[in-house]
Design a protein with these regions (language model features):
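Transmembrane-helix signature of polytopic, membrane-embedded enzymes
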Residues: 18, 110-111, 135-158, 178, ...
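Transmembrane-helix motifs of polytopic, lipid-linked glycan transferases
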Residues: 114, 118-142, 182-186, 316-322
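Membrane-interface transmembrane helices that cradle and orient dolichyl/undecaprenyl
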Residues: 140, 183-207, 218, 373-376
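Perimembrane helix-loop-helix junctions
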Residues: 4, 191-195, 227-257, 323-327, ...
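Hydrophobic, aromatic-rich transmembrane alpha-helices
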Residues: 237, 305-329, 340-343
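Membrane-lumen/periplasm interface segments of specific transmembrane helices
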Residues: 238, 248-292, 395-407
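Short acidic/glycine- and proline-prone juxtamembrane loop motifs at membrane-interface regions
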Residues: 166-175, 354-355
Length: 410
């Protein structure tokens, strides 16, 4: 049997990518440490997630379906309807937050809060690392090693993604972002396999399961991510137009897998699942937001917070994409299209869901920018492009590290 850790599978590129991801994790851990160093009790949102998740793990009902006052945790009027059901999320985030606490051998008291309060953040830190690894894998396949490292460098020193992974004064939107990224690129990968003359379901069952898992993670973390279901179908049919019937079969199978996993998040309680689905806010868009100038400013701020380097790199790559036909191929166009769509959906959802769409757009934007830069690096201007890209990455990294150093304790 061929060994797994061969030079081809795990060489210098993988080692360097691992170091970048460790740097990302270290920055997120620093944020968690800065917050938990003095704060002995979780804030109201985190306390609600932990309390509701703990309730479900201990068989006292389903998390946020509905939120029960008897637990001692107040209802959040911004995230629950009048019946106490969370209209934005399934129990996934609650269950994931509380799951690591099942391993804590002592009481969850204030004396030991310095230690156990790290545990609810572990799943979200892991999601941040997994999203970074997924981004590097996709960017490397699309743009080569150089493009992959550019995208991963953007990601690993992105203030907004570091903050989201650490859940530092924000919602755990990193889970929905990871699910969205996995859904889109798994659908594209599955579509490419349809050109091989093999049985549709038998050969693709692993990718079907992976697509279903990605859908369950995304929709379970944010109900409005249901838009990924038709988006996945669109990519399946577009990439493999000669085998659209096979693509439709795979899409249906993946949706069934995703629905089963989402039902499992409710611990297979049919009544709570049905009531939660009935009250879920799958579509809360309002087009009035597009008439408000402040919404556009907020999107611009989000892009700047995502990566300071985008202030220079994004305009350059957009102009290049518009004026140079060579860059307008599927590998660049698809992530740009998804990023733009997510930005529009973020603007149309001014409440909790909007932040999830805006964050989910950022990894796709990194793929697009790195892809266009990789194309520019193949021209006669490679030395100039390489120098400018290096300067931009150094500036972005330095500004992020400086901002982290100035984070107040507590």
């Amino acid at each position: 049997m061929r060994p797994y850790f061969t030079r081809e599978r795990f060489g210098q590129p993988q080692s360097f990518a691992g170091l970048l991801l460790l740097a990302f994790l270290a920055q997120a851990l620093w944020l968690v440490h800065a917050e938990l160093r003095t704060a002995r009790e979780p804030d109201s949102a985190e306390a609600m997630r932990i309390g509701e998740g703990w309730k479900q793990w201990n068989g006292r009902g389903v998390a946020a379906a509905p939120v029960l006052d008897a637990t001692g945790i107040p209802q959040d009027p911004f995230r629950t309807d009048e019946s106490g059901f969370d209209a934005e999320h399934s129990p996934l985030l609650y269950v994931v937050s509380a799951a690591p606490l099942l391993l804590w051998p002592k009481d969850l008291g204030g004396e030991s809060a310095t230690y156990w309060r790290w545990l609810p953040r572990v799943p979200f830190l892991a999601c941040g690392v997994f999203l970074g690894a997924s981004l590097w894998y996709v960017a490397r396949r699309l743009c080569g090693n150089t493009g992959g490292f550019i995208a991963l460098s953007f990601y690993c020193f992105s203030p907004s993604l570091i903050q989201a992974s650490a859940v530092w004064h924000t919602e755990p939107e990193i889970v929905a972002a990871w699910g969205a990224f996995g859904t889109i690129f798994t659908a594209i990968a599955v579509a490419h396999t349809l050109y091989a003359p093999r049985e549709v379901v038998l050969w693709n069952w692993r990718r079907i399961v992976l697509l279903g898992v990605s859908l369950a993670i995304a929709v379970g973390s944010q109900f409005s991510m249901i838009v990924l279901v038709p988006m996945a179908l669109g990519f399946l049919l577009y990439v493999a137009p000669v085998r659209r019937q096979a693509g439709l079969v795979i899409w249906i199978a993946a949706c069934v897998v995703g629905l089963a996993l989402l039902f499992g998040v409710y611990f297979f309680h049919p009544h709570e699942f049905a009531e939660s689905m009935r009250r879920a806010g799958f579509w809360g868009a309002t087009w009035r937001a597009f008439t408000v100038l402040g919404v556009y400013k907020q999107v611009a701020v989000q892009i700047g917070r995502a990566c300071p380097a985008l202030a220079v790199a994004l305009p350059v790559t957009l102009v290049t994409y518009a004026t140079w036909p060579r860059t307008r191929y599927f590998g660049n166009s698809a992530p740009l299209l998804v990023a733009v769509l997510f930005f529009l959906l973020g603007m149309a959802h001014p409440h909790v869901a909007g932040g999830g769409f805006l964050l989910a757009a950022i990894p796709f934007l990194f793929i697009f920018v790195s892809g266009v830069l990789a194309d520019l690096l193949e021209t006669q201007y490679r030395p100039l492009v390489m120098a400018c890209t290096g300067v931009v990455l150094v500036f972005s990294t330095a500004s992020t590290l400086l901002a982290l150093a100035q984070v107040p304790q507590g």
